[in-house]
Structures are given as structure tokens and as C-alpha cells.
Design a protein with these regions (language model features):
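Glycine/Thr-rich phosphate-binding loops that ligate phosphate moieties of nucleotide
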Residues: 1-158
Length: 158
């Protein structure tokens, strides 16, 4: 497959390689702009997986679901790929930009509008739940390709 490692300003967590450079791996004569676009979307999911895997490993917990919001969550392909990569349900917020909701909630707490966090959290509703459906073998193959591409970018060729 085609992989985009978007290290345009280096790679942050969990790689911590500020000098890494962006690269596209796996290009052939048969690859076109659709492959590069897909690789760009997939790179978002791979990077989220890298971080979630690190956090769940360190915390000793298992991720069952992830709440998401923001512009990229409109992309159904990306959300399905994210669910598959994390092997977890993706709960897409009905409110596209939850940052604004966060400001409203903080203001509400300051004014004692809500008695508890649970009461304020009820404002955030789920628009869509996306369940993982990719076979484990395919998931491992794709993610292994991503890890190899990242290792090449950061100079770990072994």
C-alpha cells in the first residue's frame, strides 16, 4: 500500500523526532492521486492509533470506544478506518466543534448552572456510532506497513 508519513514539522509523540521529514512510501506506476489522498486520511488514523496504544499500554487499560468531534469526523471513510485501526467503537459527536461546547460548559460551571459533570456531559450527544469491521489479519498488515514507513522516515531501517 501507499503510506504518507506527514512529518512536515517533524514527528511528535510517541516518536519524538523533530527533525523527521515527510515522505510517501509504496508509490508505484499504478498509484495515483486517489492513493495519496487515501494515504493522507489513513495517516490520521495511524497516528491516533500510535498515541492511543501508548496511552492504554501505560495506563493498563483497554479502549472500548472513542468520542470524536471536529471537521475530519465528517469523513465516513476516516471514521471507519479509525474504528478498525483501534478495534473500538467511534462515537461521533452531534456537535461538530466541541471546543465551543467546552467553553459553554466551563461558563456553566462558573455560574453553577450544573450540579455535576454528568449533568453537563449530557449536552454532548452522539450523532453516529461506527463499529470496527476489518479482519485482524488485514489490520495488522496495514499497521505493520505504517510502522515500517515511519521507521524509514526516522532512520530505523532494522
Amino acid at each position: 500500500g501507499v503510506y504518507l508519513v506527514p512529518a512536515f514539522t517533524g514527528l511528535g509523540a510517541p516518536w519524538w523526532k523533530p527533525d523527521a521529514k515527510a515522505a510517501i512510501w509504496g508509490m508505484t506506476l499504478n498509484a495515483g492521486k486517489a492513493h495519496v489522498l487515501r494515504a493522507g486520511l489513513e495517516s490520521i488514523a495511524y497516528q491516533v492509533k500510535d498515541l492511543i496504544d501508548m496511552m492504554t499500554r501505560q495506563a493498563g487499560i483497554e479502549l472500548k470506544a472513542l468520542r470524536v468531534d471536529g471537521g475530519p469526523t465528517k469523513n465516513q471513510f476516516l471514521m471507519q478506518f479509525q474504528a478498525d485501526m483501534l478495534h473500538a467503537v467511534i462515537n461521533r459527536s452531534e456537535i461538530e466543534e466541541a471546543s465551543a461546547l467546552g467553553a459553554v460548559v466551563m461558563n456553566g460551571f462558573a455560574r453553577k448552572k450544573w450540579a455535576s459533570f454528568q449533568e453537563a456531559a449530557a449536552m454532548r450527544t452522539i450523532d453516529n456510532c461506527i463499529a470496527p469491521c476489518m479482519e485482524e489479519k488485514e489490520l495488522q498488515s496495514l499497521y505493520s506497513g505504517w510502522r515500517e514507513a515511519v521507521k524509514k522516515v526516522i532512520g530505523q531501517n532494522n
